[in-house]
Amino acid sequence: MNINVAELLNGNYILLLFVVLTLGLCLGKLRLGSIQLGNSIGVLVVSLLLGQQHFSINTDALNLGFMLFIFCVGVEAGPNFFSIFFRDGKNYLMLALVMVGSALVIALGLGKLFGWDIGLTAGMLAGSMTSTPVLVGAGDTLRHSGMESRQLSLALDNLSLGYALTYLIGLVSLIVGARYLPKLQHQDLQTSAQQIARERGLDTDANRKVYLPVIRAYRVGPELVAWTDGKNLRELGIYRQTGCYIERIRRNGILANPDGDAVLQMGDEIALVGYPDAHARLDPSFRNGKEVFDRDLLDMRIVTEEVVVKNHNAVGKRLAQLKLTDHGCFLNRVIRSQIEMPIDDNVVLNKGDVLQVSGDARRVKTIADRIGFISIHSQVTDLLAFCAFFVIGLMIGMITFQFSTFSFGMGNAAGLLFAGIMLGFMRANHPTFGYIPQGALSMVKEFGLMVFMAGVGLSAGSGINNGLGAIGGQMLIAGLIVSLVPVVICFLFGAYVLRMNRALLFGAMMGARTCAPAMEIISDTARSNIPALGYAGTYAIANVLLTLAGTIIVMVWPGLG
């Protein structure tokens, strides 16, 4: 039996789509030295090659892919998006604006200089910034621009071509820049990170190990009674001195949870909760009494929960003001915009931040109710909210504003982005509304992006050979300029205008470029995870600004002559 693969793929759009995705994802696993190609470029390369053989896909699949992707970008940005505008994130907002704005202006200038059309120019901007949101925003705006069919088809093909030719240039140049730019400035990144650590009482170890608290029990002996000197637990400040707290006391056979007025007496049996190293450092006065192995005394339910910051008495407060340890709870992690932050007593909490807290189940529940809510332990997505806000986003995208002879519409990209932000923001404020497990959100976002990349590659593949011959050299030069010059401008602005700490500044610059591989290099150079503070500060807002940049470049292009 003979199987004509070409006819089989051309006759089945779904099969073709998943063949492209499978081959592209395999290609994306390849590494060039320390650089991995990545899923996006793998799928794009495979789709361009198959596009040269005149394979094509239904445009509805392409549109659905980009819609899912941009909506999920908004959902991820939502919890922290508004805090960037309304509080101490103004420096991060300004850095993101400088990075995206300078790249947009430079791309427009180079596009006019080389005589390109809007498709090549917008594609070059998206590729050089390694930003699929730019590509998505520009593509959607082009489709709603009113161009005649043939001109629109050429612009969309050139959009994909420009992106494909400059993506690797943008990625490699930024990674090289992240490795060497810190060495070209006068301040050592490791020293800058240590300075922040000293000022804020941070652990600078990027690979800090997290342990669960353990419980051990001791019988109070004469040494411990002498050590307490008749003071109650509040006056002693047990946690400050030992790193452990007394969870239970058995006295005369009666088991009780002590309050701050309790005074230890000879023969008491006490249950201490703390990290393993805190137990190891206990004063000998504790260990001189006999260790007790009592099931009832040691029977505590130690849990670890993810607590979402929501309530007004926690939002805007510093981490130290929560006094978690005074309530018998231990903080393991602080996560903002899916980025793990250093545990810093001076970190100001934003609505939607996630604190991973360990301790007795009752105490953790109490602290969670005080600062927000415990994240739902469910793998069930609120599909009703997801679909409803998706519809709202599409309807917002249909709105058109008319000014004399000029009309302006938000388009699907901006509408879905806004609706996604609102869903993410509302989820951060209402624990039972709009829940989407992070794994599900990441899967939908990644799948939507891959479908979109497959579609644009197949549609642009037929013209890539001509494009490479005519504009390959120009694209290389333009890609390097748009990738690196905004980074230098952003550095100068942050270092000499905003006067930011260099470790935070370089982290924020990589966040403004939404480039995780470059961020890892900055953290390695600083030998600290402190740059993650800056990365998280700009990441959410940069994703939104990059999408808008794709829309803006298409809108302003006709007016430049």
Curated annotation (Swiss-Prot):
InterPro entries named among the record's database cross-references: AAE_transporter (IPR050144), RCK_C (IPR006037), RCK_C_sf (IPR036721), Transp_YbjL_put (IPR023017), YidE_YbjL (IPR006512)
Domain annotation RCK C-terminal: ranges: 200-288, 292-373
GO biological process: potassium ion transport
Classification via SUPFAM superfamilies: TrkA C-terminal domain-like
Subcellular location: Cell membrane
Record keywords, A-Z: Cell membrane, Membrane, Repeat, Transmembrane, Transmembrane helix, Transport
GO cellular component terms given for this protein: plasma membrane
RNA-binding listed as a keyword: no
Topology class, membrane: Multi-pass membrane protein
Cross-referenced Gene3D superfamilies: Regulator of K+ conductance, C-terminal domain (3.30.70.1450)
Residues spanning the membrane: 8-28, 32-52, 66-86, 94-114, 158-178, 383-403, 406-426, 451-471, 475-495, 540-560
A GO molecular function held by the record: monoatomic cation transmembrane transporter activity
PANTHER family: K(+)_H(+) ANTIPORTER SUBUNIT KHTT, TRANSPORT PROTEIN YBJL-RELATED
Family: Belongs to the AAE transporter (TC 2.A.81) family. YbjL subfamily.
Protein name: Putative transport protein YbjL
Organism the protein comes from: Shigella sonnei (strain Ss046)
